[in-house]
Amino acid sequence: MLRVNAADTAWFPADLELLAHPGIAAVVLPKAEHAEDVAVVHRASGGKPVLPLIESALGFEQRLSLAHAEGVQRLAFGHIDFQADMNMRATEDELLPFRVALVLASRLADIAPPIDGVTTALDDAELLRIDVLRARRLGFGGKLCIHPRQVVVVNACFTPDADEIAWAQRVIAADAAAGGAAVAVDGKMVDRPVVLRAQAILAEAAARKL
Protein backbone atom coordinates (compact mmCIF):
# COMPACT_ATOMS: atom_id res chain seq x y z
CA MET A 1 0.00 0.00 0.00
CA LEU A 2 1.40 3.38 -1.01
CA ARG A 3 0.56 6.71 0.59
CA VAL A 4 0.95 9.53 -1.90
CA ASN A 5 1.23 13.22 -1.13
CA ALA A 6 -1.94 15.28 -0.96
CA ALA A 7 -3.49 16.39 -4.24
CA ASP A 8 -2.74 20.07 -3.61
CA THR A 9 1.01 19.55 -3.16
CA ALA A 10 3.79 20.01 -5.72
CA TRP A 11 4.77 16.34 -5.38
CA PHE A 12 1.39 14.88 -6.31
CA PRO A 13 1.93 14.71 -10.11
CA ALA A 14 5.19 12.80 -9.67
CA ASP A 15 3.52 10.44 -7.20
CA LEU A 16 0.86 9.61 -9.78
CA GLU A 17 3.56 8.31 -12.10
CA LEU A 18 4.54 5.69 -9.51
CA LEU A 19 1.07 4.25 -9.02
CA ALA A 20 1.13 1.73 -11.84
CA HIS A 21 3.99 -0.15 -10.16
CA PRO A 22 2.98 -3.83 -9.86
CA GLY A 23 3.99 -4.03 -6.19
CA ILE A 24 1.33 -1.55 -5.06
CA ALA A 25 -1.88 -3.14 -3.76
CA ALA A 26 -3.78 0.05 -2.86
CA VAL A 27 -3.28 3.80 -2.52
CA VAL A 28 -3.87 6.06 0.48
CA LEU A 29 -4.79 9.64 -0.44
CA PRO A 30 -4.12 12.00 2.50
CA LYS A 31 -6.07 15.22 3.03
CA ALA A 32 -8.81 13.82 0.80
CA GLU A 33 -11.44 16.47 0.10
CA HIS A 34 -12.68 16.01 -3.46
CA ALA A 35 -14.05 12.94 -5.24
CA GLU A 36 -12.36 14.11 -8.44
CA ASP A 37 -8.92 13.73 -6.82
CA VAL A 38 -9.78 10.19 -5.75
CA ALA A 39 -10.81 9.35 -9.32
CA VAL A 40 -7.51 10.72 -10.64
CA VAL A 41 -5.58 8.48 -8.25
CA HIS A 42 -7.70 5.46 -9.11
CA ARG A 43 -7.17 5.88 -12.85
CA ALA A 44 -3.46 6.65 -12.56
CA SER A 45 -2.98 3.48 -10.53
CA GLY A 46 -4.59 1.32 -13.19
CA GLY A 47 -7.68 0.67 -11.10
CA LYS A 48 -6.15 -0.05 -7.70
CA PRO A 49 -8.32 0.51 -4.59
CA VAL A 50 -8.09 3.96 -3.02
CA LEU A 51 -8.41 4.82 0.68
CA PRO A 52 -9.25 8.51 1.18
CA LEU A 53 -7.83 9.77 4.48
CA ILE A 54 -10.27 12.20 6.11
CA GLU A 55 -8.11 14.84 7.83
CA SER A 56 -9.93 18.15 7.46
CA ALA A 57 -13.27 19.83 7.98
CA LEU A 58 -13.89 19.88 4.23
CA GLY A 59 -12.93 16.23 3.89
CA PHE A 60 -15.34 15.33 6.66
CA GLU A 61 -18.11 17.39 5.09
CA GLN A 62 -17.51 15.55 1.80
CA ARG A 63 -17.34 12.11 3.45
CA LEU A 64 -20.32 10.65 1.60
CA SER A 65 -19.10 11.97 -1.75
CA LEU A 66 -15.66 10.51 -1.04
CA ALA A 67 -17.15 7.20 0.03
CA HIS A 68 -19.01 7.01 -3.30
CA ALA A 69 -15.99 8.13 -5.35
CA GLU A 70 -14.55 5.98 -8.11
CA GLY A 71 -12.29 3.22 -6.79
CA VAL A 72 -12.83 3.82 -3.07
CA GLN A 73 -12.49 0.66 -1.01
CA ARG A 74 -12.91 2.25 2.41
CA LEU A 75 -12.38 5.53 4.25
CA ALA A 76 -9.75 6.24 6.90
CA PHE A 77 -9.80 8.83 9.70
CA GLY A 78 -6.75 11.00 10.30
CA HIS A 79 -8.03 12.38 13.58
CA ILE A 80 -4.85 14.22 14.60
CA ASP A 81 -4.75 16.46 11.53
CA PHE A 82 -8.54 16.72 11.70
CA GLN A 83 -8.33 18.13 15.22
CA ALA A 84 -5.70 20.65 14.11
CA ASP A 85 -7.85 21.79 11.20
CA MET A 86 -10.87 22.14 13.48
CA ASN A 87 -8.88 23.86 16.25
CA MET A 88 -10.08 21.14 18.62
CA ARG A 89 -8.45 20.16 21.89
CA ALA A 90 -10.34 16.94 21.81
CA THR A 91 -10.46 13.82 23.88
CA GLU A 92 -11.94 10.64 22.47
CA ASP A 93 -15.40 11.74 23.66
CA GLU A 94 -15.38 14.85 21.46
CA LEU A 95 -14.30 12.79 18.44
CA LEU A 96 -17.05 10.21 18.88
CA PRO A 97 -19.67 11.84 16.60
CA PHE A 98 -17.14 12.25 13.80
CA ARG A 99 -16.11 8.61 14.01
CA VAL A 100 -19.72 7.42 13.98
CA ALA A 101 -20.45 9.64 10.96
CA LEU A 102 -17.63 7.99 8.99
CA VAL A 103 -18.97 4.54 9.83
CA LEU A 104 -22.43 5.65 8.70
CA ALA A 105 -21.12 7.14 5.44
CA SER A 106 -19.28 3.92 4.69
CA ARG A 107 -22.40 1.87 5.26
CA LEU A 108 -24.54 4.16 3.10
CA ALA A 109 -21.99 3.89 0.30
CA ASP A 110 -21.87 0.10 0.72
CA ILE A 111 -18.09 0.02 1.11
CA ALA A 112 -15.94 -1.71 3.72
CA PRO A 113 -15.96 -0.30 7.27
CA PRO A 114 -13.53 2.60 7.76
CA ILE A 115 -10.08 2.51 9.33
CA ASP A 116 -9.54 4.45 12.56
CA GLY A 117 -6.61 6.78 13.13
CA VAL A 118 -3.39 6.06 15.00
CA THR A 119 -2.70 5.80 18.70
CA THR A 120 0.41 7.90 19.24
CA ALA A 121 1.46 6.29 22.54
CA LEU A 122 4.16 3.83 21.46
CA ASP A 123 4.78 2.24 24.86
CA ASP A 124 1.23 1.95 26.19
CA ALA A 125 -0.20 -1.34 24.95
CA GLU A 126 -3.23 -1.03 27.22
CA LEU A 127 -4.20 2.38 25.82
CA LEU A 128 -3.78 0.97 22.33
CA ARG A 129 -6.01 -1.98 23.23
CA ILE A 130 -8.68 0.38 24.62
CA ASP A 131 -8.54 2.51 21.47
CA VAL A 132 -8.82 -0.49 19.14
CA LEU A 133 -11.72 -2.06 21.03
CA ARG A 134 -13.57 1.27 20.99
CA ALA A 135 -13.05 1.53 17.24
CA ARG A 136 -14.33 -2.00 16.75
CA ARG A 137 -17.43 -1.31 18.88
CA LEU A 138 -18.17 1.77 16.77
CA GLY A 139 -18.06 -0.27 13.57
CA PHE A 140 -14.56 0.43 12.27
CA GLY A 141 -12.88 -2.38 10.38
CA GLY A 142 -9.26 -1.60 11.16
CA LYS A 143 -6.81 0.88 12.67
CA LEU A 144 -3.79 2.70 11.35
CA CYS A 145 -0.52 1.90 13.13
CA ILE A 146 2.25 4.38 13.81
CA HIS A 147 4.83 1.68 14.67
CA PRO A 148 5.22 -1.98 13.66
CA ARG A 149 4.97 -3.17 17.26
CA GLN A 150 1.37 -1.96 17.39
CA VAL A 151 0.30 -4.40 14.68
CA VAL A 152 0.04 -7.44 16.98
CA VAL A 153 -2.33 -5.69 19.41
CA VAL A 154 -4.46 -4.22 16.63
CA ASN A 155 -4.82 -7.55 14.85
CA ALA A 156 -5.64 -9.35 18.09
CA CYS A 157 -8.36 -6.86 19.04
CA PHE A 158 -10.02 -7.05 15.63
CA THR A 159 -9.97 -10.86 15.70
CA PRO A 160 -12.99 -12.67 17.21
CA ASP A 161 -11.92 -14.47 20.38
CA ALA A 162 -12.97 -17.95 21.48
CA ASP A 163 -15.88 -16.65 23.58
CA GLU A 164 -17.28 -14.60 20.69
CA ILE A 165 -17.02 -17.53 18.30
CA ALA A 166 -18.69 -19.89 20.77
CA TRP A 167 -21.51 -17.39 21.34
CA ALA A 168 -22.03 -16.98 17.60
CA GLN A 169 -22.17 -20.73 17.11
CA ARG A 170 -24.78 -21.04 19.87
CA VAL A 171 -26.88 -18.31 18.29
CA ILE A 172 -26.81 -19.88 14.83
CA ALA A 173 -27.60 -23.33 16.22
CA ALA A 174 -30.47 -22.05 18.38
CA ASP A 175 -31.94 -20.02 15.54
CA ALA A 176 -31.83 -23.00 13.18
CA ALA A 177 -33.41 -25.30 15.75
CA ALA A 178 -36.18 -22.81 16.53
CA GLY A 179 -37.51 -22.90 12.99
CA GLY A 180 -38.74 -19.33 13.11
CA ALA A 181 -40.07 -19.46 16.66
CA ALA A 182 -38.86 -17.12 19.41
CA VAL A 183 -35.65 -18.30 21.02
CA ALA A 184 -33.15 -17.05 23.62
CA VAL A 185 -29.42 -17.63 24.01
CA ASP A 186 -27.70 -16.92 27.32
CA GLY A 187 -30.94 -15.42 28.58
CA LYS A 188 -31.24 -12.90 25.75
CA MET A 189 -33.69 -12.91 22.86
CA VAL A 190 -32.29 -13.85 19.47
CA ASP A 191 -33.78 -11.79 16.64
CA ARG A 192 -32.62 -11.03 13.11
CA PRO A 193 -29.96 -8.42 14.04
CA VAL A 194 -28.45 -10.83 16.58
CA VAL A 195 -28.30 -13.60 13.97
CA LEU A 196 -26.65 -11.24 11.48
CA ARG A 197 -24.05 -10.28 14.07
CA ALA A 198 -23.36 -13.94 14.80
CA GLN A 199 -22.99 -14.67 11.10
CA ALA A 200 -20.56 -11.78 10.72
CA ILE A 201 -18.42 -13.06 13.61
CA LEU A 202 -18.27 -16.56 12.13
CA ALA A 203 -17.49 -15.18 8.67
CA GLU A 204 -14.60 -13.16 10.08
CA ALA A 205 -13.35 -16.16 12.04
CA ALA A 206 -13.46 -18.26 8.87
CA ALA A 207 -11.62 -15.57 6.90
CA ARG A 208 -8.90 -15.56 9.54
CA LYS A 209 -8.92 -19.38 9.56
CA LEU A 210 -9.73 -19.60 13.28
Language model: regions and residue ranges:
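Expand to "…catalyze enediolate/carbanion chemistry for C-C bond making/breaking, isomerization
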Residues: 1-210
